[in-house]
Structures are given as structure tokens and as C-alpha cells.
Amino acid sequence: MKQTTKFNKRLTGIVMMVVLGVSLISCVGNETEPLTFAYLADTHIGTAIGANDLRNSVRDINKMDNIDFMILAGDATEYDLAGELDTVKAILAELKVPYHIIPGNHELKWSASGGEKFKKLFGDDKFNVAYKGYRFIGVNQGPLMRMGEGFIAREDINWVHSALKKMWPKKQPVFFVTHYPIDHTVTNSYEFLDIIKHYNVQAIMHGHGHRNLLSNYSDVPGIMGRSNLSRGGPGGYNIVTIKNDTMTWVERHPVEKVNLEPWLVLPLKDFEYTDSHKALKPDMSVNKQYPEVKVDWSYDSEYSITAAVTVVNNRVIFGNRSGKVIALSLDRGKELWSYQTGGPIFTEPAVMDSFVYVTSTDSSLYCINLKNGKKVWKYKTKAAIVAHPAIYDNKVYFGGSDGKFRAVNAKTGKLVWDFMKISTYVETKPLIAKGKVIFGAWDTYLYALDAENGNMQWMWKGEKSGLLYSPAVVHPVYANGKVFIVAPDRVMSAINIEDGKTVWRSNTFKVRENIGLSEDASTVYAKTMWDIVCAISTEGDKPETRWSTEANYGFEIDPSIPVERDGNVYFATQFGFVYSLDATDGSITWQHRIGSNLLNTPVVIDNMIVVSGMDGKVTKLVTAN
């Protein structure tokens, strides 16, 4: 029977009954033996109360004899640093029942390991298990290492598709576990729904919103579970029971040992879904307004790309999450060579002469021959590297996740010096100017070191405390005696390069993590978090706005950088747009949409724009001369 679901919600007391209006199917689960599991989300270890609240829930679960397993639906920690994931692992090791866990945005965006430590500790960042006739598939939505909306990585989309195709029986009832809701906050949610709606999906269970809530994701029931935290009230989780083809959700307070009345009772049914998620698909109509912009070629690497490409000698060089460094021909987009490192790559390659320099989460800096892709040398550190390398005066400068910043001889791969006073990890690409190497870290500080010997010159800190306000992602730029940065405190700062003193700070525009420099160094450009691109003078001791343009791109937190070339400013967004503005007044000259997902900083050569995306694709646009 074909079923188009409609929700008719009736609240009786605090019990929500959801009637979906089709007959039960005989293959749904076990009619006599109930399945019961504990459902936790958003434990946020690293906060003052997170670890204790999780311990309380684990102790409580261990005292019950009817719990078959436990699920933790992401944001287990505040960050992937300072041993927070180890704490989660140690607490969950006390469970007497199996558990299944996925990462959330906190473990993947703020990650010293690029998400690799989570996989190492818990075996994977996804799961596919079956209990008593029901299948549970868990997959994360990032965003992986870059600030943006949620996104299901291309490699994970493929994994989900493969898991479902292998499933037997084909009509087995399936529950998906995600961290984000599968709605507009996940930029490629339509791709996910296109796949799963061919199967008997009973519900998508998730966290992120820190409350209990029933939703509807293109006709698929969506169930948000509360945060485990006791912030603002009792800590708690949900006990979920499936019995007689009905799923019941009950909130449990472990310290008080109290079960509330069921807040959701969901009949399980034989679902056959219609295509009702067209509104989530990207609107590409803007491309018809600017027919002078065309796609010349697109290359699909099949794994997430989180950094800009480098274009040199008619080659397009980039790394991706598979750990490969890939070289394409600029003219046709054909693969010329690839080199496999030992871990995912989240950084932009640097090039000097005939050599490519790439950092990898396998803890190494690689030097690769530009012509043939052969390794020249490898420099190994003691932790993952998620920071971009920069080259100056025959040295490769890069930060690490081991509390160090290094300079390595670009020809020999030998250490020149290291700086060992960083308390967390480095993610940015350093600026080298006026004999200094300048970079931020996830410890709230901007550092200036002597480029020759690594000695500290100065440290700078913004006005807000807390790691999340660190100037750690922005690539600093230099002009007219000042270093310019932006940070998650939404303030642009100009800092004297000689002594690290603040020249000015401005919150006129709500900036975040991107800033670019004009070709003549007279202006810095930044995308704001809402619609506006601003151009600020680099001259003088006070901020002066040259122009601001309402580009109408909506909410924007993609850290990709505005780039000026030949009188135009180019930038990309988290929703797959590339813009070109007139550098003199900020007027829009054209825009083009490549897809729905986050794009990295565009590289512009003449009338060619090469841009990589989180979807694993590299696209070359060309414009009419």
C-alpha cells in the first residue's frame, strides 16, 4: 500500500499520540519481546557539568535490567582537544550494555585531529546495527573542520546508500540517528532524503536542539531528544521502547530516578514515501541571469575538500579527506597524478619552485614533486596537522596539534626551529611579514614570532574570553604597518605589527572568520554573517568604510576568503554561490551557483575561477572577456 504521511497531533495531558493511518506490517520487529534503549544527546563533556551528568546517566542505565543498548547522538564533547573525547570513552566504558555513538558539530568543527581521534577511540564515526528486527544507522552531519551549516560528507552519503542496498530484508524497518535535524540546516539534506525514502524508514532521531520535539522531515518523522545536561533543570535522557509495533519515548531523570509520562507514542508502519522534499533542493535559476559565466569543467574527487586549491604551472593541486594529494590539468580538469598520505587532508597546498608542500592528519608535512607526484621528503610530528603551510625564504612554516609551531627547511625537510608554547592547536595559514610569522591558535591568542629563529615577539588577545572566540581560523593579512584579522567575536581588528598593540577594533560589520586584501594593499574585504560584504581602508588609525554591499546571500559563516583580481572581488558562500563584485564600489557584476554546499576560497586566473567544495568537487568557471 502506498502511504503519504500526514500528522494529526493530539495532546492528551502530556502524552503525544501520532497517528499515521496505515495498517501495521507483519515484518516490523518482534511482536512479543520489547526492544528498549537509552537515547542520549548533547552531553558536552568539557563544560562544568557535562562529565558528572553523563556519569549519572550511565550509573542509572546500569541499574536497569531491560535496556538493550544505548545511543549517543552527537556533541558528546565541547571540542576534540584536551582529552575530552578520552573522558567520554572512559565514562562510557562503564556501561554494561552496548553503545553506539556519532560525533556532532562540536567534535568535528573544533577538532585537533580532523575528526580522526573520534574514529580511533570509538571504532568509527558512524554505525549500522540491528536489534530484534530493527535496523539503526548512525551518520554525522559535520560540519567538518569548517564553520558552516550541517553537511553530510559525500563519502558518508555513499556509505549510507551502500548500507541500505545491502540490507536484508529490504523492507526491514530502519531508524536513522543523526546529530542535526534533516532540514534546511543540512545543506545537502535532499541528497540524503533522495536515498533513504526508497526504504522503510520509521524515523530520523537526532539531537542538537537540546529538547524533546517531534518534527516532520519531508514526511519522515523526526524525533529530537533532549540534552543530557542538567543546565537549567534536571539532567536527563530518553528511554525508548518498541513493543507491538509502537515506539514510546519517556524522559528519564537519573538523579531523581523519575520517569515522566510518555511524551511521544509513535505507531510503526510500512512507509512508502513520495518526493515531497523539492523545496530543499538548490534553486539554480540565478545562473540564467548571468549567462556569461559558464562551467568549463568539474572534477569529482569523491571525498570532502575543505580548503582552497593551489593553481601553478597549469596544474590545479588540492588534498581531500581520503588523504590524497591530487593534481589536475587546468585546461581540461584531467587527473595528472595523485599521492596518498596516511590521513585526511584539510589544508591548502603550498608551492615553491617545482615542489608541493602539504600537511596531513597523519602528523606529517610532505614535500612532493610538482611534475610527477613523487614524494621528495616527509617531516613527521607527534600529532595530527590541520594547519595550512606557508613558504617564505626557503622555509615552510606551519602549526601543529602538538602545541608547536615549526619552520622546516623547504629543500631538505630538516627542522630549522620550533616554538613550543601553544596550549592547544593551530588551524590557520600563517602570515609572514616584516620579519615576523603571525598566526592564531585555539587558545584565544594571536602570536608573532621572529621568522628566523622562532623567538616570541608579541602576543595579542581579544576582549572576550573563551576558546570559541579565538582568532584561530582567519588568515591574517598585512598592510601599512598593521595586521588585520577578524574573529568569532564578530569584530575586525587592526594591530601594530611591531609591538602587537591594538590600533583599532570595529564591530560595525558582523564579521567572523574571513578577510582578504586588495591587490594594492589599500583595502581589506570581508563577508559579514548576514548579506553584506564590506571594504575597509588599511590606511590611518581609525576604521574607514570604503563601501559596503548588500549581496543578499543570507546567513553566512563560511570562512572562505574574498579575493581581488583585476578590479573585481570574488568570494564563495556556504550555500554554493560564487560572487563577483566591482572592487571600486562593491556593485555585483555576476553570481553563479555551483550547488548547495560550502565552497572554499576561489582561485582566479584571468577569466578563470577555480573553486573546490565540501562535496568533493573542483569546478572551473570561465567568464566572457
Label every PLM stretch briefly:
Residues 329-333, 369-373, 409-413, 450-453, ...:
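Short loop/turn segments that connect beta-strands within beta-propeller blades
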Residues 62-69, 148-221:
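His/acidic metal-ligating clusters that form di-metal
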Residues 37-56, 77-79, 108-121, 143-154:
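Acidic/histidine-rich helix-loop elements
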Residues 50-53, 74-92, 108-120, 185-191, ...:
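Metal-dependent catalytic neighborhoods of phosphoester/phosphodiester hydrolases
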Residues 27-87:
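N-terminal active-site segment of His-dependent metallophosphoesterases
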